[in-house]
Amino acid sequence: MMKGISSVSQSINYNPYIEFNRPQLQISTVNPNPAQSRFSRPRSLRVLSLSADPSANRNPKSAVDAHAPPLVVVGSANADIYVEIERLPKEGETISAKTGQTLAGGKGANQAACGAKLMYPTYFVGRLGEDAHGKLIAEALGDDGCGVHLDYVRSVNNEPTGHAVVMLQSDGQNSIIIVGGANMKAWPEIMSDDDLEIVRNAGIVLLQREIPDSINIQVAKAVKKAGVPVILDVGGMDTPIPNELLDSIDILSPNETELSRLTGMPTETFEQISQAVAKCHKLGVKQVLVKLGSKGSALFIQGEKPIQQSIIPAAQVVDTTGAGDTFTAAFAVAMVEGKSHEECLRFAAAAASLCVQVKGAIPSMPDRKSVLKLLKFSI
């Protein structure tokens, strides 16, 4: 069994109240006032000066007061099996890859890794298999890796860790095939109070669509009731998003392809993107954060003028895997730190620019010092 991660055998019915090991921070670190109810949220977010020099902070893992409500990511964790190829194979064709390796990834794990590497207190709620891929992910995310708190990650012995085949082409673009594994099949029907407690006490929550919609709905409803902002990254399943989920989120974050799929509308021009976003507004989503790849990003707030952000050019594009996750997580970190919308977009753009310059998803996530340095020299 992996260190710091509880094991759940599913040869019998899953018990959502099963005890699990918590060797690290307890939930009390989320609530700076022990006199408050375990489910009450701090009324204010205490953020320290965000020094570009991590050594200037009391906690080398965090640039923010440890009592600040954390970023909580509920989602997927995958082992990304990379194969570098010159081009995609044609139907019936077999081609040779230049190289191959396995790295930790998955949209949820990527976003959690990014939050922690940006030195904001970050918790990950997810499911792994008891296998080599699960161990790889736990080591990449945990104290010896990115510094993500894994108190709410559970492992199961009858489902494999989720994995993905990433076909990386010579121009840095990629195509991905995902096997859900534990991400899709190891969750309980009803989320435990323990798992919901951490999201109720969060400063902000990130969701994606690589885990069951039923889990996202339970989390989003609990978060909405607690008054915690939640961002839903559209990446993952290509099925329609349930209205129950849309009704409980604050920000919907698709890329332009996902926006087109979601609305059934073209998204080739900014005008078309704006029209597609208007359809999302009619579905009840007031804020839509659209990732536009090489064209940058845009935040659409219902009733307001869109806020556009150009890309911050990368010295070289090595691998775009994880760039969208980096952008979303960096935006969330800036948002929970109280930055303006414009500052959030720029901070996220800088993080994404650094991400695409390194191969792999989690290995490419930038640290705060690098992001601040890029922002300083790209004004």
From Swiss-Prot:
Pathway: Carbohydrate metabolism; D-ribose degradation; D-ribose 5-phosphate from beta-D-ribopyranose: step 2/2
Domain of life: Eukaryota
Catalyzed reaction equations: D-ribose + ATP = D-ribose 5-phosphate + ADP + H(+)
CDD domains, per the entry: ribokinase
Subunit structure and binding partners: Homodimer.
KO phenotype (gene knockout): Abnormal accumulation of D-ribose. D-ribose hypersensitivity; normal growth except in the presence of D-ribose, which leads to chlorosis and growth inhibition.
Binding-site residues for substrate, renumbered to this chain: N78, A79, D80, G106, K107, G108, A109, N110, E210, D325
Annotated family: Belongs to the carbohydrate kinase PfkB family. Ribokinase subfamily.
Active site: residue positions: D325 (proton acceptor)
Subcellular location field: Plastid, Chloroplast stroma, Chloroplast nucleoid
Enzyme nomenclature, EC number: 2.7.1.15
Residues given in the record as ATP binding sites: N255, K291, L292, G293, S294, K295, G296, G324, D325
Protein's recorded name: Ribokinase
Gene name tied to this protein: RBSK
Pfam families per the UniProt record, alphabetical: PfkB
Cofactor note: Requires a divalent cation, most likely magnesium in vivo, as an electrophilic catalyst to aid phosphoryl group transfer. It is the chelate of the metal and the nucleotide that is the actual substrate.
Keywords: ATP-binding, Carbohydrate metabolism, Chloroplast, Kinase, Magnesium, Metal-binding, Nucleotide-binding, Plastid, Potassium, Transferase, Transit peptide
Enzyme class: transferase
Function recorded in the entry: Catalyzes the phosphorylation of ribose at O-5 in a reaction requiring ATP and magnesium. The resulting D-ribose-5-phosphate can then be used either for sythesis of nucleotides, histidine, and tryptophan, or as a component of the pentose phosphate pathway. Can also use xylose and fructose as carbohydrate substrates with a low efficiency. Can use GTP, and, to a lower extent, CTP and UTP as alternative phosphoryl donors.
Regulation: Activated by a monovalent cation that binds near, but not in, the active site. The most likely occupant of the site in vivo is potassium. Ion binding induces a conformational change that may alter substrate affinity. Repressed by calcium, rubidium and sodium. Substrate inhibition is observed in the presence of high ATP concentration (Ki=2.44 mM).
GO MF annotations in UniProt: ATP binding; metal ion binding; ribokinase activity
BP-aspect Gene Ontology terms: D-ribose catabolic process; nucleoside metabolic process
